[in-house]
Amino acid sequence: MMKGLVIWKDGHASLEEMKKPEMGEYQALVRETAGALCGTDKEIIYDVLKGFHNYPTVLGHEGVGRVEAVGSKVKNFAVGDKIVLPFLDDGEDFYSTWGAFAEYAVIGDAEAMMEDGHTVGDGVLTEGNMAQKKIPQEFDDVEVF
């Protein structure tokens, strides 16, 4: 289990227990260390983001974390790597609006999937998969934003 900051339709927030995400063979488990609010998050909190109706939700598509475990086919991430984490999935308990305000997330290794012959139909080239990148260890987790 893990904790995540959940936003409810009426705009209030609460810290909730939820399932820790399970990683697949092309994914890595990342422990979140920092997250940032953006204008999209604010619009979701105040329920004014056009077309968004998926409450309760875990906010955050601007996060930083460290890899804690990797799937068997991951080639481009290793335990201990520092990662920029946009567009995350926080598990099954709450609809995720990217999920950086939860303790853990999974990221995909799109490059390894492509090397192994996976295609767009397999979800390889989604914006989220392509945006998840390693950053230098010496970068401060908060200053990255």
Would you name each region that the model predicts?
Residues 12-15, 39-40:
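Short N-terminal binding/cap micro-motifs at the start of the first secondary-structure element
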Residues 15-17, 64-66, 82, 104-106, ...:
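Conserved hydrophobic/aromatic beta-strand scaffold that supports enzyme active sites
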